[in-house]
A protein has these predicted regions:
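Cysteine-centric segments in proteins
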Residues: 19-107
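N-terminal signal peptide c-region/cleavage motif recognized by signal peptidases
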Residues: 15-17
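Positively charged n-region of N-terminal signal peptides that target proteins for export
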Residues: 1-4
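Active-site bordering "gate/hinge" segments
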Residues: 7-8
């Protein structure tokens, strides 16, 4: 019986949804704004979202490098943004596109 309860408890933890946390965000296009921050995986990938703003997903490819996608309207598809994004040396909460120099930050 204990084993069954243990298996059920582990399954519940694995199936538990991720929860968004309040954060402060910045993008080159939208400036500073309050947002929701949600971790996407163990590598450090994350998503930021806010009403009236695009939703951004930062997918960690390797330490310090990421691919970024954006959803520009509710229910829309994620569109890959140009270039690899590098973690900023000045602020580790920020990512900067090598190609366009667009910046995305979440604190």
């Amino acid at each position: 019986m204990r084993l069954l309860l243990g298996v059920v408890a582990v399954a519940a933890m694995i199936a538990a949804p991720a929860f968004a946390k309040d954060a402060d965000c910045y993008t080159t296009d939208d400036g500073d704004y309050p947002c929701n921050f949600e971790s996407l995986d163990a590598a450090g990938s994350f998503e930021i979202s806010a009403p009236g703003k695009p939703t951004f997903q930062v997918w960690i490819d390797r330490p310090g490098e990421a691919s970024v996608g954006a959803v520009f309207e509710a229910g829309g598809r994620s569109v890959p943004l140009p270039g690899t994004y590098d973690r900023s040396e000045e602020d580790g909460a920020c990512w900067v596109s090598r190609e366009t120099e667009a910046e995305l930050c979440a604190w």
